[in-house]
Amino acid sequence: MTSTRGEAAGIPSVSLNDGHSIPVLGLGVGELSEAEAERSVAAALEAGYRLIDTAAVYGNEAAVGRAVNASGIPREEIYVTTKLAVADQGFGTSQDAARASLERLGLDYVDLYLIHWPAGDHGKYIDSWGGLMKAKQDGVARSIGVCNFNAEHLSNIIDLSFFTPAINQIELHPLLNQAELREVNAGYGIVTEAYGPLGVGRLLDHAAVTGVAQAHGKTPAQVLLRWSIQLGNVVIARSANPDRITSNLEVFDFELTDDEMATLNGLDEGTRFRPDPETYTGP
């Protein structure tokens, strides 16, 4: 299944296990102020992005919604993701939180609603998954999924609910390439979505990355995004800089060789720059 979303910028889409599809590259707005988020989303949509990723805990859903609604782009062409905060986990509270997110966004539905963190409480995230299933049934969210879930978290919710997430969004970059978890996701038919694809900037001057960039006449950031896309991931790239937002789109006119992919894959050392999902408990 393909989508018109992102076609203007040449962004392909991938099919989800529920029949919907999602662009393979999007803009993230984590840690951006409301003003920064509104400007960034407006710039991204103008540049051709059609996937925007926010969360309740980011505190900028309203700004994202303003930019989406002011863009003049038909709503069905924009893919909006938001996430359930740890504090709102639970069967009923997750549904209330989803509707509160819609109100802040000023939208009738979100394309994707995610549990932001498992947060260590087995019962809570399972109850929350039931709440997300109800939110999907009620039309609040077109697709539902999870973030930061490991193999055990996934099996817990799937075995108990008989319903599989569409997406698992995880920290993923060459220093943490998540090969085993990507394989688990694929086994369930779950699309892997990568956040932190630049390794919080730590990889931009790595010799292996800059060498590949020079070979293609591309920036290190473009190489890192291309690497993740070639692995089969959907990629969320955060930026408040309009020039970088545009530059990050220029990843569909070249391809990394098998040797270059192997070089970047070989950088994996299990390094996290974001919290460990097995120990993180909020917010």
Swiss-Prot record:
This is Aldo-keto reductase Mkms_1984. Keywords: NADP, Oxidoreductase. NADPH binds at residues 196, 198, 200, 236, 238-240, 244, 247-248, 274. One of its GO terms (molecular function) is aldo-keto reductase (NADPH) activity. The keyword Cytoplasm does not apply. The keyword NADP applies. Belongs to the aldo/keto reductase family. Its EC number is 1.1.1.-. InterPro entries: AKR, Aldo/ket_reductase_CS, NADP_OxRdtase_dom, NADP_OxRdtase_dom_sf. The active site is at residue 58. It is an enzyme of class 1 (oxidoreductase).
